[in-house]
Design a protein with these regions (language model features):
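Hydrophobic alpha-helical segments at protein termini of multi-pass membrane proteins
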Residues: 1-237
Length: 237
């Protein structure tokens, strides 16, 4: 049991920490002299995300055996994104470019905690012996990718003062992902379909993450800074 917990932590929280380093290193010291966000605020929201992700996962376990149900998938997609919106939609974050990173922080916290909980819980269920650690790892990584990206999307909405427009965008992506990954848990699902849905959900999470973090982020930072009447010449490409 203790070994399972350690492995689950490495899979879930480890993926979150690695992704955090890869994304943020270009936006903070020493890559730039003036970081694009406050470390205390970021890690405070990351901690809030860990707590929220843990609470959501505890609720998720009550529906074990129905994880494949469409209504459950949609409901939890909404809960995930509402948690991010409620935390970020405070006046102190409105119209500020660093809110993008705080959205990323709470999202990656939620994703990391949920991935850890899922890996540990699933590994302890006798009825799921075929679920390998490799499968847990893939689900953990895509969970972290998805929630960090949708968190940044909601952060963009708060920064642009259009929170509900971007919340809806994040919700659509989250619902699509949950509907795909839920099919992995259909009773007596064929192995071929399990891997097909796993690949599709991974491609969705990875594609959306790449779009938000690598394609859009520099441009969005410039636009929000312009809204604030500011500019920077050190925005990473």
């Amino acid at each position: 049991m203790e070994l399972n917990m350690i492995i689950a932590a490495v899979i879930g929280l480890g993926a979150a920490l690695v992704l955090m380093y890869v994304v943020l290193r270009k936006y903070t010291y020493p890559a730039v002299e003036q970081p694009f966000f406050s470390d205390p605020s970021f890690f405070g929201l990351f901690t809030v995300g860990l707590i929220a992700g843990t609470a959501i996962f505890v609720g998720y376990t009550f529906f074990y055996g129905s994880w494949y149900a469409i209504l459950i998938a949609i409901a939890f997609a909404a809960i995930f994104e509402l948690a991010k919106l409620i935390v970020l939609n405070l006046k102190r974050y409105h119209g500020k470019s660093d809110t993008l990173f705080y959205g990323f922080g709470i999202g990656i916290g939620i994703g990391g905690a949920f991935a850890f909980g899922f890996a540990f819980y699933a590994s302890s269920i006798d009825e799921m012996p075929a679920m390998s650690w490799i499968l847990f790892g893939v689900i953990a990584v895509q969970t972290v990718l998805l929630h960090s990206a949708t968190g940044m999307t909601i952060g963009e909405g708060i920064a642009r003062l259009r929170p509900f427009e971007f919340f809806l965008q994040a919700l659509i992506i989250s619902v699509a992902y949950q509907l795909l990954i839920s099919q992995v848990f259909v009773p007596d699902q064929s192995e071929m379909l399990i891997y097909a849905f796993l690949i599709l959900s991974f491609l969705l999470a990875l594609g959306y993450f790449h779009h938000v973090v690598y394609k859009k982020l520099p441009k969005v930072i410039r636009e929000v800074l312009r809204m604030e009447g500011k500019s920077r010449k050190d925005i990473p490409l």
